[in-house]
Amino acid sequence: GPKEPEVTVPEGDASAGRDIFDSQCSACHAIEGDSTAAPVLGGVIGRKAGQEKFAYSKGMKGSGITWNEKHLFVFLKNPSKHVPGTKMAFAGLPADKDRADLIAYLKSV
């Protein structure tokens, strides 16, 4: 698979992360259920990219990523740079704290 990103992920606050999820992510992503707009994100930590019932891009399917804190931290800063060709039409979360909080929330669900 791809190399592990060389980043240190700060401690995040899951409740702040939930607010970020609700405002930035929930228009497309759900935590559970059968959303078809975007992959369902409950249990995403430890999951191989491109697994859920979703028509993933070739870039995502072929990325070889197993989602962990470091990959999410880098991906969420600039999705199309980390996984070229991704269908995720989101510019990214520039603030390290926002990404750390969102990851803390995703770890909790």
Swiss-Prot record:
Major place of residence: mitochondrion
Keyword Disulfide bond: no
Modifications made to the protein after synthesis: Binds 1 heme c group covalently per subunit.
Ligand binding (heme c): 25, 28-29, 88
Alphabetic keyword roster: Electron transport, Heme, Iron, Metal-binding, Mitochondrion, Respiratory chain, Transport
Pfam families: Cytochrom_C (PF00034)
Molecular function terms from GO: electron transfer activity; heme binding; metal ion binding
The organism's place on the tree of life at top rank: Eukaryota
GO cellular component: mitochondrial intermembrane space
Signal among keywords: no
SUPFAM superfamilies xref list: Cytochrome c (SSF46626)
Location relative to the cell: Mitochondrion intermembrane space
InterPro entries in UniProt: Cyt_c-like_dom, Cyt_c-like_dom_sf, Cyt_c_1A/1B
Family: Belongs to the cytochrome c family.
Described function: Electron carrier protein. The oxidized form of the cytochrome c heme group can accept an electron from the heme group of the cytochrome c1 subunit of cytochrome reductase. Cytochrome c then transfers this electron to the cytochrome oxidase complex, the final protein carrier in the mitochondrial electron-transport chain.
Protein name, entry field: Cytochrome c
The organism of origin for this protein: Tetrahymena pyriformis
Upper classification of the organism: Eukaryota, Sar, Alveolata, Ciliophora, Intramacronucleata
